Swiss-Prot record:
Zn(2+) 1 binds at residues 61, 82, 184. Its cofactor is Zn(2+). It is an enzyme of class 1 (oxidoreductase). Disruption phenotype: The deletion mutant displays a reduced formaldehyde tolerance level. Cells lacking this gene retain acetoin reductase/2,3-butanediol dehydrogenase activity. Its EC number is 1.2.1.46. Activity is not inhibited by EDTA, which is probably not sufficient to displace the bound metal. InterPro entries: ADH-like_C (IPR013149), ADH-like_N (IPR013154), ADH_Zn_CS (IPR002328), GroES-like_sf (IPR011032), HCHO_DH_non_GSH (IPR014184), NAD(P)-bd_dom_sf (IPR036291). NAD(+) binds at residues 62-63, 66, 212, 232, 237, 277, 284, 311, 313, 348, 350. This is Glutathione-independent formaldehyde dehydrogenase. Keywords: Metal-binding, NAD, Oxidoreductase, Zinc. The gene is yycR.
């Protein structure tokens, strides 16, 4: 159906440091062709277990921005986008359960469903989709070369295992701005809060008021936190956090986070903390970029025996880092402090499939209001470069690309 009837496919393409463009990349096939970032072992990989989606929504993510800023080794020509929601318009011959017309959420982790990691729900480190290292994602550096989904159409492999089918198509379209967050940031934020041990009555500090930080804050509320404090240096993003009931601290105005927390809680520590910033962190006060700043500060303010959820991205190669150690992902972390306080650290990609079905139920029931929390803002595919620019400038928005004008 799709391959014969359609030929064009506009997509967001990385063109080098600071630049993305919307270009025609050709209609997808059920095969992974050679291209930017595709390892030799993945070239011409057949995907009869896959489907072609007509993309309904695809979101700009903070981890996309790391690449666009030139802070990774992403190759020019890489098609971006790993937050994908769409309608199935073509199925491979080995697809048994997914049907044409299904509206689905695509977990950003690509996972085969067959390896020992997938069978133990560690889909974020699948062993069979990326020849270079465990784990994979669409449109991302060193992640297997799978073509990104900031496009009109995209191929998704291992469809029966991976895709989350929405039970009612009409309801799904009504709630699409919430449901589009299931591909990444809602599970990622929830994973951060959940692995930090947030439960009924917890006090929580969230580092970062970008979309993932706001998703973690909303998730902490869903998990029963009594007080959620969000820290950032962007006043617009802090105002967005306050809009749904969070307390906030501007970390640029003070170099002692514990004192800021004490002004809110009456004590300088929290039960749980979540790092939603990652390696492009800024130091407290006016210290400028300091990659270990967030990790060190959350160790400082998390109570003895507490847990730290770390969904913020850290990399093994950072060509834009200011010192030689940081270029290889080596950070000056006060690990002795974490050891002395018996902290638990949970890092890595989020296994989105662990959480997305239950979070879908929370959205469909009205319990979760994730689009409101992250200020979901719809833009056209042609406006994606401006969306990247505005997001890079600190816009307090989660940009949702609508490639076909479905949401008008």
């Amino acid at each position: 159906m799709g391959g014969m009837a359609l030929t064009g496919n506009k997509a967001v393409v990385y063109k080098g440091k600071g630049t993305v463009a919307v270009e025609d990349i050709g209609y997808p096939e059920l095969i992974l062709r050679d291209g930017p970032g595709v390892p030799k072992a993945n070239v011409n990989r057949k995907c009869e277990h896959g489907v072609i989606l007509k993309v309904i929504t695809t979101n700009i993510c903070g981890s996309d921005q790391h690449m666009v800023r030139g802070r990774t080794t992403a190759p020019e020509g890489l098609v971006l986008g790993h937050e994908i929601t769409g309608e199935v318009i073509e199925t491979g011959r080995d697809v048994e359960f997914i049907k044409k017309g299904d509206i689905v959420s695509v977990p950003f982790n690509i996972a085969c469903g067959r390896c020992v990691m997938c069978k133990t729900q560690k889909t974020h480190v699948c062993l069979n989709v990326n020849p270079d290292r465990p784990g994979s994602a669409y449109g991302y550096v060193d992640m297997g070369g799978w073509v990104g989904g900031q496009s009109e159409y995209v191929m998704v492999p291992y469809a029966d295992f991976q895709l989350l089918v929405f039970p009612d198509k009409e309801q799904a379209l009504e709630k699409i701005l919430d449901l589009t967050m299931l591909s990444d940031i809602f599970p990622t934020g929830f994973h951060g809060a959940y692995t930090a041990g947030v439960q009924t009555g917890s006090t929580v500090y969230i580092a970062g008021a970008g979309p993932v930080g706001l998703a973690a804050a909303h998730s902490a509320q869903l998990l029963g936190a009594s007080t959620v404090i969000v820290g950032d240096l962007n006043e617009d993003r802090l105002a967005q956090a306050r809009s749904f009931g969070c307390e906030t601290v501007n970390v640029q105005k003070h170099d002692r986070l514990g004192e800021q927390i004490e002004q809110i809680l009456g004590e300088p520590t929290v039960d749980a903390a979540v790092d939603c910033v990652g390696f492009e962190a800024s130091g407290h006060g006016n210290q400028g970029e300091a990659p270990a700043a967030v990790l060190n500060s959350i160790m400082d303010v998390t109570q003895v025996g507490g847990s730290l959820g770390i969904p913020g991205l850290y990399v093994t190669e950072d060509p834009g880092a200011k010192d030689a150690d940081a270029k290889t992902g080596s950070l000056k972390i006060r690990f002795g402090l974490g050891w002395a306080k018996a902290h638990t650290f949970v890092t890595g990609q989020t296994p989105a499939m662990t959480y997305n079905r239950n979070l879908m139920k929370a959205i469909l029931s009205g319990r979760a209001q994730i689009a409101k929390a992250v200020n979901a803002t719809v833009i056209s595919l042609d406006d994606a470069p401006k969306g990247y620019s505005d997001f890079d400038k600190g816009a307090a928005k989660k940009f949702v690309i609508d490639p076909h004008g479905t949401l008008k």
